[in-house]
């Protein structure tokens, strides 16, 4: 029967969720994940424990607009209108309430610690049976791995406890509440709590029991905590595994702890000791603890390159060997320290090839499953990432085990962000909020400190710098001196961080913001008295079509040893699947659920789409981060390994020499390179081509054998060089045919055989082409100076907030999008063997000339049309996005063939990963389906393009798809795009870079802006 102290009314009156001093009630102390094996062999092999029972599955659920609307009767029995939902899940993904996407602005009125009276509340209940033996002895716990944002728990009508911090476990002792037969859990989850003020991360705001729920049965006398650490001699030839074990229960003389260390099936070391801790101070030590030290000779060291894993089994038993319970964890022998301004792993300076990762799934919201986690890790490893930052909260417990075993360095980050506070450190400098912050930091450390993959602790994200940070920094350094601590808030270089860890600092450009300047990363290292390493906690904002200038960072990382890399923002687009009226899925972003406030598509900054399909930018990241570097001198290739610990034992170097994409010679050489070593490869005498063209040498590093994270044939690195070619002059082919010019009042018409070209004399544009009776154009060939805005072009501009510095606003204000052509010249001349059309246009807006474009079209007897373009850009207009031509072709061909850089989309400031070759792709693959439509699909360095009956030659950039720039610009979501008639072709002589240092300020480097004032390009258009 429910007692008065268990009643819902008492809980509602107490309002624990509006008290920063109450972060939990009756929650058990933090510890590493437990399984309570009763067989040490099962613990060693990590088999499922019979003492750990999942409660995942279907639960009863009722949603209420506020906790006060929940009836008292719900504590005892399910309500008649209860629905069924799957746990774990976010209730917004089941149609209850709406997810809210906001970056900085809090989704509730800022009045800490109070939350709105309309506080959506989810009431979960589950009826389950308990094993009879669990009731007879021992302790039965319930573990909630993640509940957003706070909850009260009842069991069989009796109140059990309260928990908040949505990203760490809340664990309660159920022993006194359980009974034989059926038992009923009731969990009241509140969407908002005072904890929400500490969880203002840039992500969807969702609610519910979104991580696993389980029951754990422990013996009455039990292991309550254990911590393992590794120590080494100077050359890492000898190690000590230090294990501190703590017990709970009756402290009996006969109790013993045995710690055994295993490498596969082999026991490496073992030790046994009674309880009784080492002397701490004048009052002695802890009677319920013991520290064992196991010596290990020549340990196999752990790193992300070679994740050697041992297994430590901790047995609590009696003196005669009777096992009470066993716990276990993976062990990696590794040492992390900072020395002489460098972050070292096992004595070697790390280069962090990192990425920030939110826990996100397009169908399941913030629910993570093992398949998705493994998929993320495999993709990261395959694309040369070696590190991940858990942005911005502790992740699902399984994530760390997977990172241990596959090999990724982890920055484990506390669930603290107060980005929307003014000032930002309003809470983090307030002692009333220290208990809440302390719980979030200390419990993270106590849960995760046994994982070798965790090499850095983070105090949180974007919360200013307050006294609470300093206190928690000191606590971590006291409890775990084996790892550095980082924290970006307050300027990235405060006393609360061992690492200078700025976000979006640029390579050479200072950003002197008041109070918290962002110096260039090169300058930061040289500031007076600054001796710390610099690792960017966020950089290269990968929003939409982005990552321009990424190579510049990596040039700096390799040039300056204390610039030790960074973490790209971020891994995965946070779009969510919605369904239209016909049941078709589409990708939604902020505002699509009627959510306010919202930050629109700013939730989509990923290197991969939400379904984990790669963005083209991922290839650029892979190439810049590759572990092999190459240098060509004559016929000698020098290969340098950037692996710190791994000897190349599964790599072949394939080389190919090709002329305009046609292979002339190739070979294969095994790579045998020591860590940080070099290998010199001498190529044979290379063939000299007899015909004109571009001669390229391409090398690929291929892994012939499958690995834990890649299939056989995986390409891990590549490089290309253009070789010197013999001078070759191609004489024009003599043609006896002469094109015929006909002049009318409206047009110039040129005919040659079955081909015709028509130039409109009033517009001055090529208005139509015919092959036989078939028209080739749906729109005239016109100049183009604009692009459908990228996220980086838009910046923070939106309907209600205009950023006049954003590229798109500057282009709009100058009239680039509205410019109209005024004809200055349109003449035709018949030459001895060709017809020459000469045109000139002034592109104007509101009477002001922005661009002058002069063109000649020379149509010769072979049917080739040579187009020469000269453009002048007005000195007082913004640098244009592109200088090129556009038209709508009538043809819709299946495939596109080109000689140039590819195969993936590339742009002038994001093309180091692209290779020059002859490429052939389906037309559909030439379009990149960014959820927020924008300019996409460009291919640079093109010498020849073939599409349908047409061929273009020259030196240009192009994109080709069924969507016009106008449609891309006017459409909010990709699923709303419709394939237009024909095919849109954009051929650019010049295209501005895309930028990507960040997405809220102009970030295209000066060398990739179109600032010259005068431009010249030419191409040939013919029919095959």
UniProtKB/Swiss-Prot annotation:
Taxonomy, top ranks, is: Bacteria, Pseudomonadati, Pseudomonadota, Gammaproteobacteria, Enterobacterales
The organism is Escherichia coli O127:H6 (strain E2348/69 / EPEC)
Query: Which keywords label this protein?
Result: Glycosidase, Hydrolase, Magnesium, Metal-binding, Sodium
UniProt cross-references to SUPFAM superfamilies, sorted A to Z: (Trans)glycosidases, beta-Galactosidase/glucuronidase domain, Galactose mutarotase-like, Galactose-binding domain-like
What this protein catalyses is: Hydrolysis of terminal non-reducing beta-D-galactose residues in beta-D-galactosides
Instruction: Supply the EC number(s).
Output: 3.2.1.23
Q: List the disulfide bonds.
A: none
GO biological process per UniProt = lactose catabolic process
Q: Where does Mg(2+) 1 bind?
A: 417, 419, 462
User: What GO molecular function annotation could you give as one example from this UniProt entry?
Assistant: carbohydrate binding
Sorted alphabetically, which SMART domains does this protein's record hold?
Bgal_small_N (SM01038)
**Cofactors:** Mg(2+); Na(+)
Q: What is this protein called?
A: Beta-galactosidase
What enzyme category does the UniProt record give?
A: hydrolase
Which residues are substrate-binding?
103, 202, 462, 538-541, 605, 1000
Residues bound to Mg(2+) 2 are 598
Q: Its encoding gene is what?
A: lacZ
Could you name the active-site residues?
462, 538
Query: Binding residues for Na(+), per the UniProt record?
Result: 202, 602, 605
């Amino acid at each position: 029967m429910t007692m008065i102290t268990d009643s819902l009314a008492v809980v509602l009156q107490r309002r624990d969720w509006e008290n920063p001093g109450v972060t939990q009630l009756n929650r058990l102390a933090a510890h590493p994940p437990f399984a309570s094996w009763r067989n040490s062999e099962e613990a060693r092999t990590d088999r499922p424990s019979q003492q750990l029972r999942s409660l995942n599955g279907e639960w009863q659920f009722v949603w209420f607009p506020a906790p006060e609307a929940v009836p008292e009767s719900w504590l005892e029995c399910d309500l008649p209108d209860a629905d069924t939902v799957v746990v774990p899940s976010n209730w917004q993904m089941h149609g209850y309430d709406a997810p809210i996407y906001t970056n900085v602005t809090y989704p509730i009125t800022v009045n800490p610690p109070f939350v709105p009276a309309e506080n959506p509340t989810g009431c979960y209940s589950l009826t389950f049976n308990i094993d009879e033996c669990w009731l007879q002895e021992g302790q039965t716990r319930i573990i909630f791995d993640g509940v957003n944002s706070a909850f009260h728990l009842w069991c069989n009508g009796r109140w059990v406890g309260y928990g908040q911090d949505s990203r760490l476990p809340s664990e309660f002792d159920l022993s006194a509440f359980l009974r034989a037969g059926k038992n009923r859990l009731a969990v009241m989850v509140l969407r908002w709590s005072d904890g929400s003020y500490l969880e203002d991360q840039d992500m969807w705001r969702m609610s519910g029991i979104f991580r696993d729920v389980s029951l754990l049965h422990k013996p009455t006398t039990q292991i309550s905590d254990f911590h393992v650490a590794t120590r080494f001699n100077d050359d890492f030839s000898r190690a000590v595994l230090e294990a501190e074990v703590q017990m709970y229960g009756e402290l009996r003389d006969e109790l013993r702890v045995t710690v055994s260390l295993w490498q596969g099936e082999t026991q490496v070391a073992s030790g046994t000791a009674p309880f009784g801790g080492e002397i701490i101070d004048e009052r002695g030590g802890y009677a319920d603890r013991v520290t064992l030290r196991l010596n290990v000779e020549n340990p196999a060291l752990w790193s992300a390159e070679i994740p050697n894993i041992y297994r430590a089994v901790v047995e609590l038993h009696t003196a005669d060997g009777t096992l009470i319970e066993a716990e276990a964890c993976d062990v990696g022998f590794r040492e992390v320290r900072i020395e002489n301004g460098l972050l070292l792993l096992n004595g070697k300076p790390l280069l962090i090839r990192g990425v920030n990762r939110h826990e996100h799934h397009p169908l399941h919201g913030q629910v993570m499953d093992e398949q998705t986690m493994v998929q993320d890790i495999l993709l990261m490893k395959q694309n040369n990432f070696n590190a991940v930052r858990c942005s911005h909260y502790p992740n699902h417990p399984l994530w760390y085990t997977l990172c241990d075993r596959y090999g990724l360095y982890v920055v484990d980050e506390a669930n603290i962000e107060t980005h929307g506070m003014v000032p930002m450190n309003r809470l983090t400098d307030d002692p009333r909020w220290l208990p809440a912050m302390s719980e979030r930091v200390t419990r993270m450390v106590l849960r995760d400190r046994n994982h070798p993959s965790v090499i850095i602790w983070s105090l949180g994200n974007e919360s200013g710098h307050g006294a609470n940070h300093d206190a928690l920094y000191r606590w971590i350094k006291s409890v775990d001196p084996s790892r550095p601590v980082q924290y970006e808030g307050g300027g990235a270089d405060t006393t609360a961080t061992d690492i200078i860890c700025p976000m979006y600092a640029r390579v050479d450009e200072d950003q002197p913001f008041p109070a918290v300047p962002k110096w260039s990363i090169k300058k930061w290292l040289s500031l007076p008295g600054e001796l710390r390493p610099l690792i960017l906690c966020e950089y290269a904002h990968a929003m939409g079509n982005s990552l321009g200038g990424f190579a510049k960072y990596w040039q700096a990382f390799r040039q300056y040893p204390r610039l030790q890399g960074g973490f790209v923002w971020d891994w995965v687009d946070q779009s969510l699947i919605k369904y239209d009226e016909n049941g078709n899925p589409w990708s939604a972003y902020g505002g699509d659920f009627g959510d306010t406030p919202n930050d629109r598509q700013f939730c989509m900054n990923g290197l991969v789409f939400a379904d984990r399909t790669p963005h083209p930018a991922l290839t650029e990241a892979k190439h810049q981060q590759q572990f092999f570097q190459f240098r060509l001198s004559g016929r000698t290739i020098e290969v340098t390994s950037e692996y710190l610990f791994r000897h190349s034992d599964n790599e072949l170097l394939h080389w190919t020499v090709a002329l305009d994409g046609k292979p002339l010679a190739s070979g294969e050489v095994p790579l045998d390179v020591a860590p940080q070593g070099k290998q010199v490869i001498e190529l044979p005498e290379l063939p000299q081509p007899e015909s004109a063209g571009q001669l390229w040498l391409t090398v690929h590093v291929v892994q012939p054998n499958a690995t834990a994270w890649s299939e056989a044939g995986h390409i891990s690195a590549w490089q290309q060089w253009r070789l010197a070619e013999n001078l070759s002059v191609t004489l024009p082919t003599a043609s006896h045919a002469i094109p015929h010019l006909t002049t009318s009042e409206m047009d110039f018409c040129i005919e040659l055989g079955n081909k015709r070209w028509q130039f409109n004399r009033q517009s001055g544009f090529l208005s139509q082409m015919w092959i036989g009776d078939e028209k080739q154009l749906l729109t005239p060939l016109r100049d183009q100076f604009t692009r459908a805005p990228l996220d980086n072009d838009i910046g923070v501009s939106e309907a209600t907030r205009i950023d006049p510095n954003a590229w798109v606003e500057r282009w709009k204000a100058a009239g680039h999008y509205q410019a109209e052509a005024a004809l200055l010249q349109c003449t035709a001349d018949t030459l001895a063997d060709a017809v020459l059309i000469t045109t000139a246009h002034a592109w104007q807006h509101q009477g002001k000339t922005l661009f002058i474009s002069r063109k000649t079209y020379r149509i010769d007897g072979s049917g080739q049309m040579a187009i020469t373009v000269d453009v002048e850009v007005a000195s007082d207009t913004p640098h244009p996005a592109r200088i090129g031509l556009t038209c709508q072709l009538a043809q819709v061909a299946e495939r596109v063939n080109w000689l140039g850089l590819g195969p993936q989309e590339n742009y002038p400031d994001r093309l180091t990963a692209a290779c020059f070759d002859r490429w052939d792709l389906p037309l559909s693959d030439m379009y990149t389906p960014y959820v927020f439509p924008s300019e996409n699909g460009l291919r640079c360095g093109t010498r020849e393009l073939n599409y349908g009956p047409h061929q273009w030659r020259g030196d240009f950039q192009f994109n080709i798809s069924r969507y016009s720039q106008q449609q891309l610009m006017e459409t909010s979501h990709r699923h709303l795009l419709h394939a237009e008639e024909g095919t849109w072709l954009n051929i650019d002589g010049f295209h501005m870079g895309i930028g990507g240092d960040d997405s809220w300020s102009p970030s295209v480097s000066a060398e990739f802006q179109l600032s010259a004032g005068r431009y010249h390009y030419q191409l040939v258009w013919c029919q095959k």
